[in-house]
């Protein structure tokens, strides 16, 4: 969120933690991360970043939630499912949804299925291919604590859409702030 807002894009960060939302809206951060405090403060003061506990209508949605392991060592996709279902009511034709959470192969398609079930009035790549109303992609976030701002901007990113159009749209979005290369592929390969 901060990386996009630092490029003067309107961003609404969504978190279920009301304390984190309040902290961000004061222009402060709730984690320790070099340079992030300055970027958030400037973005909030400039009117480019705000936080909310509920999703709002947007052109693009990035889902970055935990994907812990269950007791049987299987990934727990409950947070991804919850996030997808929370944005579904505010999705509109032309929206782009990108999953950034570390996820197993097939997770992006599963997320698209949850969205399709919640919004039968919209078409998704698994149904409509290139003509989908909503584009879906996967772009794993890979950063080291203490270097988040530098790595978000400088690192190469693997971006995989469910269709070539989805990949192109996701790549164009990340190029707003990314100085590294966008390595474009499909969602399963990116996962």
Name each model feature, range by range:
Residues 1-27:
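NAD(P)+-binding Rossmann beta1-loop-alpha1 motif at the extreme N-terminus of oxidoreductases
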Residues 8-11, 49, 132:
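A generic structural motif
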Residues 26-43:
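Short, conserved SAM-binding/catalytic segment
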Residues 45-58:
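Short acidic low-complexity segments
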Residues 60-62:
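N-terminal Rossmann-like NAD(P) cofactor-binding module of classical short-chain dehydrogenase/reductase
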Residues 65-67, 102, 163:
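Short glycine-/small-residue-rich Rossmann-like dinucleotide-binding loops
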Residues 69-142:
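Rossmann-like NAD(P)(H) cofactor-binding subdomain of soluble oxidoreductases
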Residues 114-138, 143-191:
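Internal alpha-helical scaffold of NAD(P)-dependent oxidoreductase catalytic cores
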């Amino acid at each position: 969120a901060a990386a996009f807002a630092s490029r003067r894009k309107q961003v609404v960060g969504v978190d279920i933690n009301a304390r984190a939302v309040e902290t961000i809206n004061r222009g402060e951060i709730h984690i320790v991360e070099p340079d992030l405090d300055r970027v958030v403060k400037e973005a909030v003061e400039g009117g480019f970043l705000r936080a909310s506990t509920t999703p709002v209508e947007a052109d693009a949605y990035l889902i970055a939630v935990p994907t812990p392991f269950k007791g049987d060592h299987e990934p727990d996709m409950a947070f991804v499912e919850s996030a997808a279902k929370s944005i579904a009511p505010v999705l509109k034709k032309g929206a782009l949804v990108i999953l950034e959470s570390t996820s197993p192969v097939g997770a992006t398609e599963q997320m698209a299925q949850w969205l399709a079930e919640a919004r039968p009035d919209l078409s998704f790549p698994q149904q409509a291919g290139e003509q989908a109303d909503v584009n879906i992609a996967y772009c794993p976030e890979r950063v080291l604590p203490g270097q988040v701002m530098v790595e978000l901007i400088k690192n190469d990113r693997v971006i995989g859409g469910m269709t070539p159009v989805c990949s192109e749209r996701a790549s164009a979005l990340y190029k707003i702030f990314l100085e590294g290369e966008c390595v474009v592929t499909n969602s399963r390969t990116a996962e």
